[in-house]
Amino acid sequence: MQKKELDYLNVLKVIGQMPFNVGKKLLLDFLQGNSNNESIKRNLLDRKELFGYFSLYSRDEVEDLVENLLHNGLIDYVPLTENKFIKIITLTKKGKKELVDPSLHNKKLSSRFAIKETQITEQERMMFDSFDFFLKGYNDEQKKAITSSSSKMLCVAGAGSGKTTVLTKRIEFLTTFKSAAPEKILAITFTRKARAEMASRLSKSQYCTNVMTETFNSFCEKIIKKHNDLIYNKPTRVVSYGEKIKIFKIALKENNIDAGLAIESYFSFGQRREKTNEELATLLMNDCYSVIELYKINNKSLEELKEHANNNQLIEQKNIEMMYKLCYSIDSFMKRNGLRDYSDQIVHCIDFFKKNKNFIPQFDHMLVDEYQDVNSSQIELLDLINPANLFCVGDPRQSIFGWRGSKIKYVLNFEEKYPNCEIITLSTNYRSSKQIVNLINKSIEGLMLPDLKSFREENANLHLVNFESEEQEINFVISKILELRIPRNEIFVLARTNRIINDISQRMRLRGIKHLVKTEEKGREEEAAIDEVTLATVHSIKGLEADTVFVIGCTGINFPCRASDHPIIELVRIDDYDKEEEERRLFYVALSRAKKNLYMTYCGKNPTRFINQKMLETIGGKTSQPSIADYNAAAKLQSHSSDKLSMLKVWRKETAQRLNLPAYIIMHDRTLMEIIEMNPVDVEDLKNVRGIGPAKLERYGEEIINILNGGK
């Protein structure tokens, strides 16, 4: 093991051995050996064993090391009890355990995948020539993936490399030239949309009409429906979303849990900001079902959830205990009433196959898309089916769903699982311009995969733009959207968090910019209309592309993301992994959506450390500031409507101070935005605004109308 791989342990040792609590600056000065620091001199810290251990590191490198430990939960940055404005760095229980049993360096190493570029033999080229009528238009790597006779194959397909086309073309090759029976071929995708797209492509070939195209869940659901009487002792069906809501309410009542108090305990003040109680209750409910699913797909009992309570702070213990009660009630209700969730489909199908191996369908060929996203239950299902030939397509660079149970190790360890397998890389990117491909290569160098090559030689517009405030940043993006003379559905605005998405969505509505919001919570596979901008979290946009992409909020707070919209999911995660490396891959996914124009924007002093020096050189060597023209265009957005919104926010702030209440209790931002959009002329009109009930109407109605009419 190289020394550098374990250096993080010395940071943990320093924090644990300090004679008193230290802040971030003092810690960094100690690690770098800054003897001019007054506190170091006064307390003789320069006599400590590890003083200056990182003196050969740059300040940025040491900061990155500390931030990585923070992001992986090994240290915490907490305010002093007696003075909340002073923060200190402390070891967490997880950090103390890491000192005794180091594992983080193994996680770092396990996210690397050292493979070479695919080699094409002369014999293979001759074969490609003989099938030119069928393979015309494909590159040599694609041709090899389509025609290879290996029984176990992994196709490492980079962003924009045409993986879906290759997968469907391989099926066509097998049925047309290899006498493969279509009904003995199963193609597995991850989404209904991908399944429909694949089925549509295959339907165009007369030899592929009987090929099974399924998602993991749809395949298992068909098995369950076919053998329901053997699996269950009563009729069962998949629970609807409406039923989930009812069951959640029953669980609250059954455990005497007040929804309002549960929300206040479960979510932080920042997480509650700008959300209604109804929205927060929905998030809590979704987390309950996610925890149940996480435990089921990992073959764990909910009883193990209790163990997590003992390993956390008091407030977290209470939340985990509450989560256990709700999850237990929900799961019990569903079992009693013959209701199944998506995780049950796979788990129950696996159990059935284990007990009834003669009912496992036999396939000559099985093809799996998005293999980097598989979880342990899906792998177990593949092992049980055990097809004669297995072809998997995946990209370790785009493994971003570890937080919901996916495991990158399955794609990284494919060769270990199948020693005689063939690994083929698709390294030509057909989506993005050359400069964008160069940029994304440099963003993910640590994964040790071959660089992607760009098929498109034209230059791209790459911009890293800094702003003084988030408001300026959003106004800049909107002004650019209004300038662009391309179909609006060729524009993506991507952000790391739902909060940023909601903020910019409100501004877009105010400007009359039609847009489609995509988030993980929405779970819908909609596509924007030709006159709609796509506004999305990065997790929800994977697999899609656009001419122009804005990645906003490129700061160290968002990439890697310090906050979580799902606090308990983070606490009770069954399998740990390197969160920072997944965040780095997430940033890669965001950048790789762009075809021609890429804007990375941020406010504050520095951009995310994921933008390294090599990336800066590709961009042009520096961060740019908005031009005078950009400032003027953004300034125009401060229209009459914006003035009214500002006046309403001032009124809300003053009212909140007068009544000693949080501003969001007076009125949510979205309610203020809707007031501006509806432009009510009297109090009666305010009745149609969501978020203004009878009490608020009576208390604030006249004041609001007065502000809108120019008074105060």
Predicted regions located by residue number:
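Conserved RecA-like helicase ATPase core segment
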Residues: 376-466
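Conserved helicase core region in the C-terminal RecA-like lobe
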Residues: 77, 212-222, 366-370, 393, ...
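Conserved P-loop NTPase-based nucleic-acid remodeling module centered on helicase motor cores
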Residues: 184, 189-277, 537
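Inter-lobe coupling/hinge region of RecA-like P-loop helicase motors
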Residues: 134-139, 143-159, 231-237, 420-428, ...
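Conserved helicase NTPase motor core
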Residues: 95, 120-159, 194, 212, ...
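Core RecA-like ATPase module of SF1/SF2 helicases and allied nucleic-acid translocases
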Residues: 192, 482, 486-582, 586
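C-terminal accessory regions
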Residues: 82, 554-623, 644-662
